[in-house]
Amino acid sequence: MRALVSVWTDSGFAALTWENCVMILVGLVLLYLSIAKEYEPLLLLPIAFGCIMANFPNTGFEDEMGVMMAIGFGIKYEIFPPLIFMGVGAMTDFAPLIANPKTMLLGAAAQIGVFVALAGAMMLGFNVQEAASIGIIGGADGPTAIYLTSKLAPHLLGAIAVAAYSYMSLVPLIQPPIMKMCTTKEQRKIKMVNLRPVSHFEKVVFPIVVAIVVSLLLPPVAALMGCLCLGNLFEVSGVTARLSDTAQNALINIVTIFLATGTGLTMSGDKFLRLETIEIIVLGLIAFAAGTAGGVVFGQIMRIASGNKINPLIGSAGVSAVPMAARVSQVVGLKDNPSNYLLMQAMGPNVAGVIGTAVAAGTMLAQFGG
């Protein structure tokens, strides 16, 4: 009997708290959404499993000297997000942005959601570092959100990562109502001219120039932009096919496993089940909605300035959920005009949003990082 009591007291069941039970349930829900509904499964699945494992008592996952130390090292010291950006860069085609550089303005306009949420978070009592980390959810860029949060507010990493990736997966549900609210049916029918061809020289020069300019203007974000541009250079140079293939397949997949699982391991019940978590999720939705609206409204301004040659729907693609936001612009446009194909035009502001979110993060790091 004494042996049985000893086994029980040493087991996880004896130390299980209601917070652990709730977070295990949250992890199971996230697992369901990632598997059954296919909501960002490559990210939400390892986050969900990490969340479940983090809430098993007496396993060592919650100890700094345990597994969390090994995986968390890459998050704490900002190793994983730049490597993710290298893979993203290798998979990104900047040609639509190069062909129509004006769409860079739409990527910038969509960042208004970041600063709307920042202001809202400060009104709710978050300090400026926490508010900046919450605001970056509006950029719809998970690696950038993790990168900024790990520097400014690491204690909020789990909530912010889950909010960022959840809203990225819900782009097709969140954006269309906002896009329709900000446009008329006739405006959504506008057809845009085909983009001009982009030369190999332009494709090679673009990432080099972006890396130099952004890194000199905003040194805190040089790691992200440098890796993004290096990955893209692997792809467009034409001489590093093996490196490009590794960056956009093996490397990004391996790093995603560690980054997402490590993020999930930060979601222990005692840290996650707080009022501030609900506030972060709500503010993240506001940020994402404001970013979408900001892009469409600026698209309206460009439509007027161009004499109805620009469809304002492409403005919603200014958030950096690549390529989901661009696909949503195409889908909404096709519903009102079946011959209207906006995907390539929308990819311009979409990839501009990747740069814009990184620049916004760099600006906040420069201002609030001290």
Predicted regions and their residues:
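Membrane-embedded hairpin module used as a gating/binding unit in multi-pass transport
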Residues: 166-239
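Transmembrane helical segments that form the transport core of multi-pass membrane transport proteins
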Residues: 211-295
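Alpha-helical transmembrane segments
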Residues: 155-173, 283-291, 314-315
